[in-house]
Regions:
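N-terminal, motif-rich segments that launch catalysis or mediate targeting to/interaction with membranes
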Residues: 20-182, 189-327
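N-terminal signal peptide c-region/cleavage motif recognized by signal peptidases
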Residues: 16-18
Length: 327
């Protein structure tokens, strides 16, 4: 162990561990599920792709925790893939030049009115007629980044870049990060629509960001759904679920993933209490109250979130396996 590494380790042990937000936790969980299901050859190939990332040293190697740095190669590789899944969120805070180059805010979510095929609208309408649907383009390869406007298209575009041997090594590395991240995002219900009302939210509540709760807002509450669950125990349950699942039973249609998240939002996320309060506040012209959200709601939210992230990890595994097996 080098002197620098020894000092870093000592300092790390003296500092409190930072709490992981649900975003980082969920993206690492789904990436770890995929990692542990892939073969050693596939894992090595992913790391070879990732090493060509334009910001590999500063955003990956320099960010690796000391306890991971001194561990075995498999643990380091798994952490790197998890960091790749988190990386698109890191791009939000880059210096201006790199933020413009890498940050794509519109890729993380989708307008609730955007539909393709038999998809369900993602919006919950309270006291107002539904907005007209936007009929999205048919499934197919997207050749240009300018054609990508939402999470569905982001998944399809980045899978294509990663799969295309003509893509530059740097482009493939960045696309790997985005694919890992967006497959997680589309499984979060509040990334797929919003609550729309006539007075408070005529253009939508931005996926729950306009609904105050004792944890911040509804979106951040869902973002924090797994924050207090033991990470390793949660990962073991997800890995066990994947082992008990036949790959042929997993629906790999991105439109289906979108539909699943929207069904959760329609049926559970926005409670009758929230909808009634929106109508009452609009009638009285008052602001919304802060919603407590009872233990039953929070428990169900945690169970749903774990199931959605588990599905994301399984689907990432199958998608990466297919891409890596492509000649």
């Amino acid at each position: 162990m080098t002197f620098r590494l020894f000092i870093s380790l000592c300092l790390t042990l003296l500092l409190p561990l930072p709490a992981l937000a649900w975003d980082a936790t969920s993206h690492r969980l789904s990436a770890y599920v995929a990692w542990e299901a892939l073969t050693p050859a596939h894992r090595n190939r992913l790391l070879q792709i990732l090493e060509k990332h334009p910001r590999y040293e500063q955003d990956f190697l320099d960010q690796m925790p000391v306890n991971v740095m001194v561990s075995d190669e498999d643990t380091k590789g798994r952490w790197l893939l998890g960091q790749a899944a988190v990386w698109p969120d890191l791009a939000r805070s880059f210096e201006e030049e790199d933020r413009i180059r890498y940050n794509r805010p519109d890729w993380h979510w989708i307008d609730g009115t955007w539909m393709r095929g038999d998809a369900l609208q993602g919006n919950v309408y309270v006291g107002v007629d539904p907005l007209p649907s936007i009929h999205g383009e048919a499934q197919g390869p997207l050749e240009h980044e300018e054609d990508v406007h939402n999470v569905v298209q982001g998944i399809e575009y980045n899978a294509g870049v990663l799969e295309n041997p003509a893509s530059s090594p740097a482009a493939r590395a960045v696309a790997l990060c985005w694919l890992l991240h967006l497959v997680g995002d589309i499984h979060q219900p509040l990334h797929t629509g919003a609550l729309v009302s006539s007075g408070l939210f005529p253009e939508g509540d931005r996926g729950g960001n306009g609904i105050p709760t004792r944890f911040g807002n509804l979106h951040s509450t869902w973002d924090g759904a797994l924050r207090n669950q033991p990470f390793d125990d949660t990962l073991r349950r997800m890995n066990s679920a994947l082992r008990q699942t036949s790959p042929g039973m997993i629906d790999m249609n991105v439109d289906t993933w979108l539909q699943e998240s929207r069904q959760v939002m329609q049926e559970f996320v926005y409670t009758d209490e929230i909808k009634a309060a929106v109508l009452r506040s609009e009638r009285r012209r008052t602001s919304l109250p802060t919603f407590a959200l009872d233990d039953d709601y929070l428990g169900t939210m945690q169970a749903i979130s774990e199931d959605r992230i588990s599905h994301a990890g399984t689907r990432l595994y199958l998608a990466l396996r297919r891409i890596l097996n492509t000649p």
